[in-house]
């Protein structure tokens, strides 16, 4: 029965993408399937409020699928998404994103504590166009996201609670020219106690004279401010970059010994090269 449902969902996705492509100009079409190589570098705080930065630079090959109902591999921000309901100005979907692990040996406040494992977050989101639309040069978007978090250590998975994450994003298409897009985003985050404990909790066995035991509380985590630019260099090559500021002040866990600073900064630079695309074309959603 489950296999039948999967087949039906994939069939509906293929049917929807075919119908969607019929009314789209050729220059706005991309392959339904593709293979990309992304070379990216980022320098972010190791965790919210950490004074230690996590620098990551990797080349990653990965497949891309641009289905109308289900898609994956189109952006580093969101690994995969599934559309539950979609109109020109409103959609309900399920999203999946992840964070890199970090060794506590490299973190001044967490030295001697368990590592911060690979963190996967998934859940529903409601996206609304408050002003403009996908065909306009300017668009104001509101996204309301709920994510369930799971940390993964080898084959062990541990539930890490939930987050609520509203996002307000302003898109400027055709910035300077038709190949450049500018975006501004404000995104506060609230988390349950299981989520905040992952970053700020200190079990008694890891307590020291300078790091007392601490039970993390649910509540406000921080707010992210982002300025990003996407630049299409050629049909196969695209640059995406962003700078970010995190405001941690006012966090529900400011008194944690693992809370280190009120502000954080970050940068991400990425080059996306499309190595291959299928002959079947669909409307671009990148």
What kind of feature is each model-predicted range?
Residues 33, 53-59, 88, 116-122, ...:
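Residues that define the transmembrane beta-barrel architecture of outer-membrane proteins
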Residues 39-43, 59-65, 78-83, 122-130, ...:
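Residues on the lipid-exposed face of transmembrane beta-strands in outer-membrane beta-barrel proteins
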Residues 36-42, 75, 93-97, 141-147, ...:
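Transmembrane beta-strands of outer-membrane beta-barrel proteins
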